[in-house]
Amino acid sequence: MWKGDENANGGHCLVNWQTVTRPKDMGGLGVPDLERFGRALRLRWLWQEWVDESKSWSGSELPCTDDDRLLFNSSIIISLGDGAKTKFWHHGWLDDQAPKYLAPNLFRLLSRTNRTVQQELRNNNWMHKLARKITSPIHIEEFMSLWIRIQDVHLQQGIQDTITWRWTNDGNYSTRSAYRIQFRGSLLHFGTDLIWKAHVENRCKIFAWILVQDKILTAQNLQKRGGPHQQQCVMCNGPLETSLHLCLICPFAKAVWNQILTWENFTQIQQQQNANPTHIKSWWEDVAAKAPRAERRRLNGVAIYTFWHIWKERNRRIFDNRSETVPQVAARIKEDIEQRKRAFDYI
C-alpha cells in the first residue's frame, strides 16, 4: 500500500510483517494477522462441536485445516468419561498426549484412524487391528509402550467426555486467547509498557517502537539499503548518523536532553545521560528502572517526545534546509508535554 506497487517486500518495509502483527505486549504493533485471526475463529467451531451438540451444523464436516486441528488439540485438556467423543488416535487423552504421537510408526500402519476411544477400547479393538500388521522391532516397542499406558485408563459409562481450554482462567474457549497463543514463543527484547503506557500521541508511540528496533531511516540504515544519505551527522557534523548517535550521543541531542531533564526535575536521569550508552533500548530501560515507580509513565512520555522532536529537527535540516537551536527544540518538547497535561488533566 505505502510503496504503490503490487508487491512490496524486503527492503521496502521498515519492520517485517511478522513483528508488526504481534500483540503489543509481545513486541509488535498489534495489527491483526488475518490468517491467525481466521484460525482462531475456526477453532471456535471445533470447541462448539465438543460442548454443544445442538448446533445445526453438528456432525457436518467442518472447514478446518490440519493445522487448525493440531492447534486445537494442543489447546485442550480432555477429561475422559465414556470415551464416545474423544478420537483414539488424534486427541490428547492419554497422559495428555495423542497416541499418534506416542506411536507414530504404528499410526502409519492404519487406514481408519477416526474411531473413538470407546470404540477402540471395546474388546481391545485397537490391538486386534495392529496385531497382523506389526513387522519390526520398533512396532513392537511402540505397541508395548502404548499398551502399558492404556492399562491405567478406565472409562466411565454414562458420563460424557469433557474438555478444558488451556489458555483462559475459567477453562472456556475465547477467540482472543486462541489468537494470542499463536504468537507464543515470540522473543521480547524490550519492555513494551515503556512505550504503550506513556502519555503521548499514537504517532509518537509508533515512532518510538520503530526507533527501539533501530529501524528509523538514519544515514546508517539508508546506507544499508543502498539509498542516498549524508556522510556525517547533520546535527553536529560528526560521525555517520546512527539511531544511538542521533538520539543520545550527539552533542546537540545531549544539550536538548539536559534542558528537558532539568525542566522536568529528573536530576537522577541526568547522571545516566553522561554515561556512554550502547543501545537506546538498554539506556531507556536503565533510566526507567532508576526512576521512582510513580514517575515512570511521565518519564517515558518525556523520553518519547524528546526522541520525536530530535528526529523532526534532523528532518528539518535535511529536507527543509533550515534549523532550530537547542532552546527552540526544547521549547517544542515542553509545549507538547504541557498540552498533553492540559488535555488529559494530569500532572
Regions found by a protein language model. Give the residues of each.
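A helix-boundary/hinge signal
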Residues: M1-I347
